[in-house]
Regions:
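N-terminal Rossmann NAD(P)H-binding glycine-rich loop of SDR-like oxidoreductase domains
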Residues: 2-27
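N-terminal Rossmann-fold cofactor-binding loop
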Residues: 37-41
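NAD(P)H-binding glycine-rich loop region in Rossmannoid oxidoreductase-like domains
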Residues: 54-97
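Active-site segment of SDR-like NAD(P)-dependent oxidoreductases
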Residues: 79, 110-117, 170-173
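Conserved Rossmann-fold NAD(P)-dependent oxidoreductase catalytic core, especially the SDR/UDP-sugar
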Residues: 92-142
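Active-site YXXXK catalytic motif of short-chain dehydrogenase/reductase
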Residues: 143-147
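NAD(P)-dependent short-chain dehydrogenase/reductase
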Residues: 152-206, 212-214
Length: 218
């Protein structure tokens, strides 16, 4: 059986994968052990015999050793690129001590394509355009720039014969979404509490969502 390590596992993607595994879906891929690194991990009371979950309740910068695993999902993020770089460098340092090179998935974002001015579907062949990224306002600009920065780091890691995949994720919905600060969460929580639903836009907005189970299965 295989072992999986999720770095930054308290976020929506990390928690969704854990729930997916608890419901026996990861057994298909022969994963029966999950390690979760997170400073703010929301511990799940897992009583399932088919899968074991271990929490490492620390910051990446405070970790000197990680368990030997077959797969790593890197979900760590920080709007400060300097701090994000420190996380990655610490990860790289620890990775060198692994006896066997694990497969690595970095969760990037569709934000790296920049602001979609023409309202057309982004294609994987589309090149990253820093001018379009600069068209973002607020937190999203920093978020996109951090993802671009880390993508380059993981591409360099792939050149060292690591099996690296980069997932440019967009918007998701699922069981855990109501616990996170997203637009769709606000709408659902308002409806559940029978409050007025407020849309912070004066124009028609169209948004597509992937379910977290489909994300985890992929």
């Amino acid at each position: 059986m295989k072992k999986l390590l999720i770095l930054g596992g308290s976020g929506f993607i990390g928690s969704s994968i854990v729930n997916y595994g608890i419901n026996k879906n990861l057994i298909i891929n022969k994963i029966n052990k999950i390690y979760i690194l997170s400073r703010t991990a929301k511990f799940l009371q897992n009583k399932k015999k088919h899968i074991s979950i271990t929490y490492i309740n620390k910051s990446m910068l405070d970790v000197n050793k990680l368990p030997q695993v077959d797969y790593i999902i890197y979900c760590l993020k920080n709007s400060n690129i300097k701090i994000s770089n420190n996380y990655f460098n610490q990860f790289l340092k620890i990775l060198k001590n692994f006896k066997k090179k694990p497969k690595i998935l970095f969760t990037s974002s569709g934000a790296v394509y920049g602001k979609n001015i023409n309202k057309k579907k982004d294609m994987e062949s589309k090149k990253i355009d820093n001018i379009l990224i600069d068209n973002f306002v607020g937190y999203k600009k920093k978020y996109a720039k951090e993802k671009v920065f880390l993508e380059e780091k993981f591409k360099e890691l792939a050149k060292k014969n690591y099996n690296v995949s980069i997932a440019r994720c967009y918007t998701f919905i699922g069981k855990n979404i109501i616990y996170y600060n997203y637009a769709i969460s606000d709408l659902i929580n308002a409806a559940n509490s029978k409050k007025k639903i407020i849309l912070n836009s004066h124009i028609d907005v169209f948004r597509s969502y992937m379910h977290s189970d489909d994300l985890s299965n992929w």
